[in-house]
Amino acid sequence: MSLKKRYRETIQPKLLKDLSLTNIHEVPKVMKVTINRGLGEAATNAKSLEASVKELAQITGQKVVVTRAKKAIAGFKIRQGMPIGCAVTLRGDRMYAFLERLINLALPRIRDFRGVSAKSFDGRGNYTLGVREQIIFPEISFDKIDAIRGMDITIVTTARSDEEGRALLSEMGMPFQSN
């Protein structure tokens, strides 16, 4: 059963009861997943940006947006408009497919994995996760990468509090650390 179908049929009714909500539309849901990769070396090394864009496109199955510097910072040796990273925003079916792959395939492949931190919520039910290496995703072949780079994954939910957000992600199967 896909994550989207499981959310509709089992997770939504369970959260409605557990969070003691009255309306099905009050139940928190995932709105979007944003994957971001900041590349400091992109200012000097154009190949690293190309490789990153290709990797994120492979992981997400969607076109990647190159992020550019808003203003010049001499200390970082960047000028306004220089490419400094890349990002992808996933919604709908691609979002659920990515979350399913992240939870069931990618996270368990992290070395010495003991669960993700439960403290990475922002106060409004959104969760951000930092991944140190892209090779945890099955789409990326270790032989074809030029360098190991990480990325930030932000899961934006309609939850009103961190507790609601955590309940939603726990039901979806996110492996939180037990402190």
From Swiss-Prot:
Keyword Lipid biosynthesis: no
InterPro entries assigned to the protein according to its UniProt record, in alphabetical order: Ribosomal_uL5, Ribosomal_uL5_bac-type, Ribosomal_uL5_C, Ribosomal_uL5_CS, Ribosomal_uL5_dom_sf, Ribosomal_uL5_N
GO molecular function term, any single one: structural constituent of ribosome
Disulphide bridges: none
Record keywords, A-Z: Ribonucleoprotein, Ribosomal protein, RNA-binding, rRNA-binding, tRNA-binding
Source species, domain of life: Bacteria
Pfam families per record: Ribosomal_L5, Ribosomal_L5_C
GO cellular component: ribonucleoprotein complex; ribosome
Family designation: Belongs to the universal ribosomal protein uL5 family.
Biological role stated in the UniProt entry: This is one of the proteins that bind and probably mediate the attachment of the 5S RNA into the large ribosomal subunit, where it forms part of the central protuberance. In the 70S ribosome it contacts protein S13 of the 30S subunit (bridge B1b), connecting the 2 subunits; this bridge is implicated in subunit movement. Contacts the P site tRNA; the 5S rRNA and some of its associated proteins might help stabilize positioning of ribosome-bound tRNAs.
Subunit-level organization: Part of the 50S ribosomal subunit; part of the 5S rRNA/L5/L18/L25 subcomplex. Contacts the 5S rRNA and the P site tRNA. Forms a bridge to the 30S subunit in the 70S ribosome.
Protein name: Large ribosomal subunit protein uL5
